[in-house]
């Protein structure tokens, strides 16, 4: 029996032996049955991997009894074909899974690139992370290289997604810190109190800031910032007053107020507004009447007009007002507002024309530089005659300097004011 089986196997491999010729008829019938069984197994193996025993008996039903060894051979071939078909089916399934997961991974990557904000971790919801373990378990050695490349690419995409998520989370976390702070809306009472405190002291101490914060119901930092801005505003106003004498803002305020009172300005002068906000359009009758009656279409300012604390009393240095009394003696500085200088000169001329000669005293430097009793005390009834129209030498004219302007005098009524010593 063993010898016949070996001869049949050798005959199938192509080695014809004399023993094989004796059983040629048997081998032909067995070979045909084996070929038909193999063909049927190849065609039906993809649909039904393991054929039933009834189909095998039907296939080999016509073989004689002494040829039962072909059944074992047939089962051997059937098992081999079954293993090959199962491996093909598993390879096809892995191919389909691989293509499906690769497409899903590509779509997920495109969705992540197109989406603005990523919510959650991308590795938990991307199928590429799940497909890595399944591909390692199911793929054969043929797809090992492809699987490793796809794993590395998917891991790289996961890493980039994680970096993107962390950056987006960081941006969202730093967003509330970058909220724009809106400006504080102060009431009139708060601004008036702060302005009053600023006139008293430009730099406020911290305990005083705490008191103001409690009184005005404002944060301490808001009051601190307000004082900083107010100091800068005051500095800008002082720098903007380039005419006529920026070293003495009280003199500037007095001159402009006097010009507004005489009618040279079409509306009342506010000392806290810089000079270039007042375009001089000339003196009109309506403006003069409005200045005389005090009626003005403009509302009163929130804070008082004595910004430099100079309007509460007449000017403390009357010896410097010769430019108002005699505008021809003082030329306007170069590069300054010529229209303002012209308007001030016109106002001074109008004031001089309206005042009779000899009735109002003139105490300017040029008028009293040659007077013998200029430095001594004078009474309210003693008046000096102005010598501005008289002939004077160049040496007798003494213009005031910055050192003279920086000096301050005591506040007193005009009739009780004493002449202060002047240095040339």
UniProtKB/Swiss-Prot annotation:
Residues 179-238 bind DNA. Residues 146-175 have a biased composition (Low complexity). Its main location: nucleus. It is found in: Nucleus. Residues 18-65, 132-178 are annotated as: Disordered. Keywords: Developmental protein, DNA-binding, Homeobox, Nucleus. GO terms for molecular function: DNA-binding transcription factor activity, RNA polymerase II-specific; RNA polymerase II cis-regulatory region sequence-specific DNA binding. GO terms for cellular component: nucleus. Residues 50-65, 132-145 have a biased composition (Polar residues). Gene3D superfamilies: Homeodomain-like (1.10.10.60). The keyword Aminoacyl-tRNA synthetase does not apply. It holds the Pfam family Homeodomain. SMART domains: HOX. Belongs to the even-skipped homeobox family. This is Homeobox even-skipped homolog protein 2. It comes from Heterodontus francisci. The gene is EVX2.
